[in-house]
Structure formats: C-alpha cells, structure tokens
Amino acid sequence: MEFFDLVKRRRSIRKYQDRQIERGDLEKIIQAGLCAPNAGGGQRAIIVAVRNRALCEKIGRLNIAKFNRNSLAGSYVSSEQPSIIDDLSIRSGFYGAPTVCAVFGPKNFLYSVADAFCCAENMALAATELGLASCLIARGEETFDNEPGAPLLKEWRIPDGYVARCFVLLG
C-alpha cells in the first residue's frame, strides 16, 4: 500500500471481532512501534502485549476508573463507534479488543509522552497495513497508579522510573 493511502485508511476502531490476531502480525506491529522516531534516538519505549481477554477487560476497566467522564458532557466522538465519552454504559476503555499493547516510557523524561505516541502511531499504521483494526488510548499512567494495577507492573518487570503512557488496541 502507498504511504498516503495507508495514512488515509487508518482510523480509530472501537468495535472488535471475537478472535485473536496472529502472533506474527503482533510481532510486526511491535517492531514497527520500536522503530518509531524518538527524542535523541534513545529507543526508550517498552511495549507489553496482553492477549488474555479477561486481563484486557480488567485493565480496560482500570483505564476509565479515574476518568471523570461526566465532566465531558456534551462532547462527542462518534455515533457509529461510540467512545467512553459518548456512551457512559461502556465499562472498559479497551472496547473488547482481543489484544492490548501498553507502551511504557521514562517517567521523568521531557519527551516520554511524545515518544510513546509516536511509537503507538507506528503500531496503528502497521496494523492498518496488515488489515487489522486499532485504536490509541491515553490515560496510561492513571491506569496502573492504583492497588489493582500496580502489581501488573511488577509481574511484567517494568523498571522503576517507567510509567505507562498509552495503549494500542488491536483486533
């Protein structure tokens, strides 16, 4: 696919089929993320892919737990594919995606958030190229800054000084 066609085709998708993506496709998507431009060429991003549906759902619920959606009353994202802002009955910020990639970056690095979102966008473009749906989700740090979320960071061996910056939903 030509680059500009790819960019035009990439959309945020919030509806997913009930099937897991292929491991080979996931590896290509992660590699695309790790090749993203970043400040100083430091390649500091850490990506954790979650393919367990129950865990994706749990983390998705943590993702919106501290988010005051009522403060955005009147905001509008999409009637075709409602977001958590459009539909308060949505209980997971991950919309049932079968695979969720958490993108981590250094907590005290000025360009950490920008670097993470460059990584995430490369991943979303790669997913589009492979014919997969994707959506970028913010509120990374808040997702794990709580009693149920913090143990996952230890389980995934995320270094001290790193925080989740964003998520890439894939399906």
Task: Name each model feature, range by range.
Residues 10-14, 34, 56:
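Short, cationic motifs built from Arg/Lys/His that form the positively charged side of catalytic pockets
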Residues 1-27, 43, 165-171:
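Specificity-determining recognition surfaces
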Residues 29, 33, 101, 106-152:
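Small-aliphatic-rich amphipathic alpha-helix that forms the alpha element of a beta-alpha
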Residues 31, 36-37, 43-46:
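Short beta-strand segments
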Residues 67-73, 80, 152-171:
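A glycine-rich helix N-cap at a beta->alpha junction
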Residues 39-42, 92-95, 156-162:
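Solvent-exposed alpha-helices and their adjacent loops that cap or buttress functional pockets
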